[in-house]
From Swiss-Prot:
It comes from the Bacteria. Disulfide bonds: none annotated. Its EC number is 2.1.2.1. Keywords: Amino-acid biosynthesis, Cytoplasm, One-carbon metabolism, Pyridoxal phosphate, Transferase. Pathway: One-carbon metabolism; tetrahydrofolate interconversion; Amino-acid biosynthesis; glycine biosynthesis; glycine from L-serine: step 1/1. The modification N6-(pyridoxal phosphate)lysine is found at K230. It comes from Mycobacterium bovis (strain ATCC BAA-935 / AF2122/97). InterPro entries: PyrdxlP-dep_Trfase, PyrdxlP-dep_Trfase_major, PyrdxlP-dep_Trfase_small, Ser_HO-MeTrfase, Ser_HO-MeTrfase-like, Ser_HO-MeTrfase_PLP_BS, SHMT-like_dom. This is Serine hydroxymethyltransferase 2. HAMAP family: SHMT. It is found in: Cytoplasm. GO terms for cellular component: cytosol.
Amino acid sequence: MNTLNDSLTAFDPDIAALIDGELRRQESGLEMIASENYAPLAVMQAQGSVLTNKYAEGYPGRRYYGGCEFVDGVEQLAIDRVKALFGAEYANVQPHSGATANAATMHALLNPGDTILGLSLAHGGHLTHGMRINFSGKLYHATAYEVSKEDYLVDMDAVAEAARTHRPKMIIAGWSAYPRQLDFARFRAIADEVDAVLMVDMAHFAGLVAAGVHPSPVPHAHVVTSTTHKTLGGPRGGIILCNDPAIAKKINSAVFPGQQGGPLGHVIAAKATAFKMAAQPEFAQRQQRCLDGARILAGRLTQPDVAERGIAVLTGGTDVHLVLVDLRDAELDGQQAEDRLAAVDITVNRNAVPFDPRPPMITSGLRIGTPALAARGFSHNDFRAVADLIAAALTATNDDQLGPLRAQVQRLAARYPLYPELHRT
């Protein structure tokens, strides 16, 4: 029996049911993990296309397989769109993820054993910025800068001193859990002083940059890497941008054949569609609401009724799409707070805070993000309601108080149906 044209529901109802369950979970609650977003239906349609069938090793016009005329068109559109979106001269859209984009960039511009300098993972950096058990900490000599113990901000004087001490070949500016903007011009000046390459990883804030509500690192960095989901709201994948033709050539070789074989044409098509969406006025409005929503949340969580329970907002606020909640002086630890919000159908993730006394699987913090709610269309008033619900859940004195909060969350979520075309009858 030929199963080529069988639907997923007909052939594999077990997987279909699990996917449907995940759709309903995403729709019925509030998704507030800062690295998650809702991909538009058009993006998912592009990713679920027949392009998944095509091998296309190489680059547009220079493939090692025949029949690539349409794949070439797709990839060239993605390249042209992302260059225009971020004002870059060169772009590689083939990396399968942000991690592989970072790996390819390091492979292109460093030798094994070279020194790199990035933000400590314990202070908000990313594991690919030099964590010892990651490739970046195994292949390279990883050193780190940290945030100040006084204000939890990156101390640029300390970064400069670390650069002079360690003389890195690459300085990495970027983060996975840091609520403020970075000074890209100062990072570049420090990199130039020690003859280092500056790589900016804008995976978390790329959507804000595209919308013009966050400074762009592209004019300052030698190389910029990013994911294409998170605030950018596209499919899971990576990109690499630069303005130097010599660096671009090295990066292209490092991606293919250095790191990857055949590119994922269906994902590149989805990236291209996401880049087109990110150039629309509606996207800029959404990113502003995302930023405003995070600031509304931060403001609510600094109010006396929350602060008196030992709950604080790291740095006192945010410049980006996320809020870092400091629970070191609270009754709840990070795991307990994550579970408390999950009980009212608000999904967040526990996160270490700088100088955290608790183990990484427990933590003393929460990372709460607004991109997914902004994508659903949440207004400023909606974000105020969400902030009140989070504050109420975190300060609840018994589990009986959580049931009514969960009902309020579900009513709020129901006002914004998610992917009605995908619901099975």
